[in-house]
Regions:
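Terminal low-complexity tails and localization/encapsulation signals of metabolic enzymes
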Residues: 1-52, 85, 89
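Glycine-rich loop-to-alpha-helix module at the N-terminal edge of alpha/beta enzyme cores
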Residues: 36, 50-126
Length: 126
């Protein structure tokens, strides 16, 4: 099992984002899977392990693609105001989690905190 960094600030950030030491790497939105081998994210800042995620198997990939194709059939007939509401809610979550996401981006990518916040802001602006 991978060790999560002992840095208190990063540990708090991971907790705020509900990231554990081992995380499922595959999700259909309703189901997650963690049957693949673990890949560990290592911070270039201090060389410490951040967390691990399971690799998606070919079978899991096919399931995700099939589920996405089925979801698209529902999404495309949903009225624009309802689709807009989904996008608005997603945007609200990004805004709510901007600081911890920015911290994680900076730690995981070796960027400054301001650059990490900027990356998240770009997602919000889209």
């Amino acid at each position: 099992m991978a060790q999560t960094t002992d840095n208190a600030a990063i540990a708090e950030t991971l907790k705020a984002l509900e990231i554990t030491s081992e995380n499922a790497g595959t999700s259909t939105g309703l189901q997650t899977s963690n049957s693949g081998k673990l890949i560990t994210s290592v911070s270039p800042v201090d060389g410490k392990n951040i967390a691990s995620v399971t690799q998606t198997t070919p079978e899991e990939y096919e399931q995700v693609v099939q589920t996405a194709a089925e979801a698209f059939k529902v999404w495309r007939v949903m009225p624009a105001p309802q689709r807009g509401e989904v996008v608005r809610q997603f945007n609200e979550e990004l805004r709510r989690l901007k600081e911890p996401l920015g911290k994680l981006v900076s730690y995981e990518m070796g960027k400054s905190y301001q650059e990490g916040l900027g990356e998240v802001q770009e997602m919000i602006d889209i």
